[in-house]
Amino acid sequence: MGRKTQMNQITSPELLAQVNPENTALMNDFVDYLRSIQRSESTINGYISDLQIAWVWSLQHNGNKFFVDWTKRNIIAMQNWMLNENKNSPARIRRLKASLSSLSNYIESVCDDEYPNFRNIIHKVESPVNQPVREKTVLSEEQVQEILDKLTELGKYDMACFVALAAYGGRRKAEICRFRVSDFGDDKLVCGGSLYKSDPIKTKGRGAGKYLNCYTLAKKFKPYFDRWMEYREQNGIESEWLFPNRSNPAEQMQVSTVNSWMETITRLAGVPVYAHAFRHAFTTALSNQGLPDNVIKEVVGWESIEMVQIYNDRSTEDTLDMYFGEDGIKIREQTKLSDL
């Protein structure tokens, strides 16, 4: 896991039993609406968690007022309490306010017959300045290789294969758990054998998520894939999943296992390591090799080219250094995927 986030327990079954029944009913109706438009259960659970925090705050500090009757002053009071008393981060406050805003939009558009005068006031109240509270680790290509070497030396071939897939494919940890062994057969090689192209894999997205063909740098990933598959054959590990659940190989590995692995890797690396850092490392490495942003966008599967800049950890100076030197402008040959 690597990074530490302050966890502040606000709700409890005892407190939730005391919240205004109208607030509970409103939340339940909202949840039914979310399911009717195919929002994912993980998204819905996030809404429930946020709203329950708001209801308990209202119980303890706002006279247990029905949400429809909240004023901007109530929003300010809750925000101030979260920031200065409960020590929540600005990002956490923004997320909770986003959930309240979504609920407000639902009331305004769906419940207008019951509450014709209701208006969404959440974003009328300025949010605290967003600033990172967790340490961000920027992994260099050398650090990634050191991690892979150490895991291989220790015989942790499953972990090495996972890191290689994260570092040379840029997928999220939950997505990596969904890869099958068949996604890395010779028939999956494209672009002159430089990339593996998987069958469609469920990725993060609205509703049930979207399905994408995921690309992985074949030459860099294959040695770690081969070692893991050899280990599996020697130890009788049979499963369609690349990373099977140890207790039930018919199922894929759980994200909780990945989090445990990241704690092990953090100890080996000597710096906080979390799975998403490899997504940044992959994007940065492609940029370092001179691939245009529009190509990186297609490889990772982003809809917007702006995502490349978000995940690219290269400094402005590093970028300029690729194109300018002692003799002025450098002439660079265009990098091909087959060169990687």
Tell where the protein language model's regions lie, with residue ranges:
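Catalytic-site neighborhood detector that most strongly recognizes the C-terminal catalytic loop/helix
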Residues: 300-325
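Short, charged phosphate-coordinating catalytic segments
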Residues: 111, 166-192, 294-295
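Short, basic (Lys/Arg/His-rich) helix/loop patches that form interaction surfaces
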Residues: 238, 259-298, 302, 317
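C-terminal secondary-structure termini that scaffold catalytic or DNA-interacting sites
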Residues: 1-14, 326-340
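Conserved tyrosine-mediated DNA breakage-rejoining catalytic core shared by Y-recombinases
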Residues: 178-223
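Active-site/catalytic core of tyrosine-dependent DNA strand-transfer enzymes
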Residues: 217-271
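Basic, Lys/Arg- and aromatic-enriched nucleic-acid-binding interface segment
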Residues: 141-173
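N-terminal core-binding DNA-recognition domain of tyrosine recombinases/integrases
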Residues: 13, 28-134
